[in-house]
Amino acid sequence: PGKVISIISNKGGAGKTTIAVNLAVALAERPNARVGILDANLQFGDVATYLNLVPRASIADAVAEGDILDEMSLETYMTVFNDRLSLLAAPARPELAEAITGGNVKAILSQLKKKYEFVVVDTATDFNEITLSVLDESDAIVVLAGSDLPTLKNMKLCLEILQSLKYGDDKVHIVLNRANSAGGLSVQQVEKSLNLKFFATIPSDGKTVLPSINHGIPFVLANHHSAVAQTVFQLAQKLAPQEVSAPPKSMAAKVLGIFS
């Protein structure tokens, strides 16, 4: 089965959707990879906008299908970004989210895992039934931290909740977004405040990130060589290490090997 990676933050504007989208695209850049994104911010999710997609259907339509949903029928509700990446979008209107339960989300994730090597999930900012269901099904939880005091206060609460839910350090990964942004605390100050070491840090780079959002082109594609894109590729590698195959032996090496 595929690996489920959820991105969470209990503070709006932390860059959750930006990181979720670019992480998914980075994973999809791997040879032969197949990646699904689930927008589980059911009321106000905008993953589709970040990818410049107009969804033909959403998770609400998939849930309305009922118990007969399987990985083949789920395909009809996905919106294709490219041949390696597809999105199951949030409902078009907030009220449509009311019919979707945590059980529905778990069932859908179960089917997505059968079809995709990686399933990246963007979430709402509150620990509601939907978010908790996503976390239960996740193999890795990326918690986004910021370097301002209100975000740090919320971050401490978020980590306490995750601890109380018995999610281990092997599953929860704290990532500092917009590291060393102007006016923010340094990486070292934030680590000291939270009493932890970050799994990864992503630099602040509004000149790359904002145009990418406004044009609906993920920066890992539009600005592949930028520092912010490279750190997302590194994050993808840390979350799901890619095995580097040994280069094929030359004919001379093979011949010499016979006599060794």
Summary of predicted features, one role per range:
Residues P1-G36:
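Walker A (P-loop) phosphate-binding motif
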Residues R30-L87:
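Phosphate-binding loop that captures ATP/GTP phosphates
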Residues L38, A227, Q237-V244:
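C-terminal-of-GTPase-core extension/linker across diverse P-loop GTPases
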Residues I59, H215-T231:
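C-terminal boundary of histidine-terminating zinc-finger modules
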Residues A60-D67, R93-A99, L149-P150:
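Flexible beta-alpha connector loops of hexameric P-loop NTPases
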Residues Q234:
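Glycine-rich phosphate-binding loops of nucleotide-dependent enzymes
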